[in-house]
């Protein structure tokens, strides 16, 4: 894993964003109430899942999130972390925050 460098992702406090080289995946890593979280939004996708969870009246299926527990979820969100101004995380490189790391690969973005 590469250490987080100021010249890599855009960073403000404990929030920074980045995108895949294709621009199809945009991610943000941040701390909330002392816990680290990572979220990635897909610009274009073809889901294999179709059942929206009960209680989710917002957008669902285009955002994935992982918290300090390490459990990944499809997020029910009313916003986006997509920002075309975010720097690119090149394939094979990684960023970390609070015990969570995201690695960019040609096959996608993996955050654990």
Regions found by a protein language model. Give the residues of each.
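Sec/Tat signal peptide C-region and signal peptidase I cleavage site
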Residues: 8-12
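N-terminal secretory signal peptides
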Residues: 14-55
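Residue-level signal for functionally critical sites in structured catalytic/ligand-binding pockets
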Residues: 21, 40-44, 66, 107, ...
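A low-complexity, Ser/Thr/Gly/Pro-enriched, surface-exposed linker/loop concept
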Residues: 38-90
